[in-house]
Amino acid sequence: MPAHKKRNISCGLFAALFCLLLSGAAIAASSPTQQVPNGGKNMSRAALAEKKQLERFGNAWSPLEATDPDFAEMRDRLIWGEVAWHGSLDAKMQELITLVVLTASQTLDGFAPHVGAALQVGATPEEIKEAMYQCAPYIGFPKTEKALRLVNEVFREKRIPLPVASQKTVTEDDRFMQGVKVQKSIFGAAIDAMHKSTPQNQRHLLRDMLSAFCFGDVYTRKGLDLRTREILTFCIISSLGGCESQVKSHVQGNVNVGNTKENLIDALTCCLPYIGF
């Protein structure tokens, strides 16, 4: 590409950060936080990584250390020695974000241990299932089902009864109405304008199915609050790449439900090791 041409920012994390920083939304900012333990300022990245891995997984060893020790060191010290200690998001939110990012990108080799880690740091089986269900409108059912099968394997190993309690709140009669209600609570009057401007031959997609399925069937469910669902959605679509328009919309949506600029930057920080820059 000639040097004078404008660069097309299409990579997931950079694109999401670009959309976030250039958003016209009045995003409340907060001071960055670091979750380093007492005395932790004197701890090395290696020590911090080991401490965090023991908390999440019960051990700090990876088979990769036997074949690619330098790579394992780079990975573990970034994820567990830096990222896991950074920011405003608690361990449960970090693990839920990790699960949806791995699901969206279909990098499932290391997925199951993070299901266990999510349970270890306090996520309920219902919260984990709801985080998975939140992926479906954005990545489709087959990819979501692949991750769900792994979740279910972990639950069986831990003797967690299946199915978990239903979190459904809508009926066939009110799923569209309740979906529109949730949409408006996130995006405001823009929803009415979108419904009015949608061409007749696209209304079944951009009005009926979007409102009834994505927001009615999924967003109205119990188990996760609206702020959590929006920040997970932001991470899911950021992981996909090439979704700048949707990312911008959900930056505004996150603001509208009470998430801060720092929350979103911290969420992207959590995504970084799994989707790259």
Task: Annotate the PLM regions.
Residues 91-95, 126, 227, 262, ...:
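Aromatic- and histidine-enriched alpha-helix N-cap/loop-to-helix transition segments
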Residues 210-216, 220, 233-234, 241-248, ...:
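Long compositionally biased, domain-poor regions of proteins
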Residues 90, 106-129, 133, 143-155, ...:
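Extended intrinsically disordered, low-complexity coil regions enriched in Ser, Thr, Gly, Ala
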Residues 103, 121, 134-141, 238, ...:
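A short structural micro-motif
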Residues 14-24:
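Bacterial N-terminal signal peptides
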Residues 93-102, 131-132, 228-238, 247, ...:
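Short, structured motif recognition centered on aromatic/hydrophobic residues
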Residues 28-91, 144-226, 256, 273, ...:
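Acidic, glycine/proline-rich low-complexity segments that act as flexible tails and inter-domain linkers
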Residues 2-14:
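Bacterial N-terminal signal peptides that target proteins for export
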